[in-house]
Amino acid sequence: MHSPHADKGNALDTVAHKTLTRGWQAELDLRFTRAAHKTVLTSARHVGPLTVQRPFYPEDDVCHLYLLHPPGGIVGGDELTISATLATDSHALITQPGSGKFYRSRGPQAQLRQDFYLAPQATLEWLPQDTILFPGANANIQSVFHLAQESRLLAWDLLCLGRPVMQETFSHGTLRNRLEVWRDGTPLLIERLHLEGGSLHTVARHPWSGTLLCYPATEKMLDGVREQIAPLGDYAGATLIDSLLALRFLGHDNLLIQRVMRAVWQSLRPQLTQKPPLLPRIWQT
């Protein structure tokens, strides 16, 4: 497991760092612990334009947190690093008020690295809004979940290639997207998506691509998910391997995808956490 920092209490340290040649170098390090009857964000250290809003508690004990990406999106040369560590018995739900955006690059790569470290009995719901890849973007995204045997995870990774609402396809650009799940140092899932030169053959020319993860899951949960994703058609499926449920889809209709993904989350959450599916307030605005 990732060793916690030595500092204690609430920490919110900010240092802006941008260079003319490399863009933003931004970091965000979050630490969650269980204190008394609720999960507390004990440390939120950030460098550059990555930050969070003040935590709130619509269901008393779970820490709901909104992650704020750089204003105006991510451009070539930006390097963003996000790390979240959840101590034993903590439970955090992290989402975003808006879509992540990777804009057209004149050459330099934009990098986003996200690491999540869950102690035994820790629960993470990682539910960001979709990430939009503008035509001409050059993006390298890596998301890694480090679990213990008794951790609980409910997460998704939603990508929008181009701006289909504006009739813009991902006609040129590069995307390297890597998604990993490890349990006690053993890989449960390593998934790669590589798009080069605007070619969308890998995704059968669908502008929407995504994965939903649930751990630990059961055959009953898998059967329920397979029923719920039927409206997405032939380009959606779900598997259960080593207690990790992975739902994958390609699609054209963002409203249908959003509706199905939220319905799956609403179904899985009570089974995984014994808590009702309370929609994040920001989703309803």
From Swiss-Prot:
InterPro entries: UreD
Lineage of the organism: Bacteria, Pseudomonadati, Pseudomonadota, Gammaproteobacteria, Enterobacterales
Subcellular location(s) per record: Cytoplasm
Any one GO cellular component localisation term in the record: cytoplasm
Keywords assigned: Chaperone, Cytoplasm, Nickel insertion
Quaternary data: UreD, UreF and UreG form a complex that acts as a GTP-hydrolysis-dependent molecular chaperone, activating the urease apoprotein by helping to assemble the nickel containing metallocenter of UreC. The UreE protein probably delivers the nickel.
Keyword Transmembrane: no
Entry coiled-coil feature ranges: none
Identification of the protein by name: Urease accessory protein UreD
Protein's job: Required for maturation of urease via the functional incorporation of the urease nickel metallocenter.
GO molecular function, one term: nickel cation binding
Family: Belongs to the UreD family.
Species, as recorded: Citrobacter koseri (strain ATCC BAA-895 / CDC 4225-83 / SGSC4696)
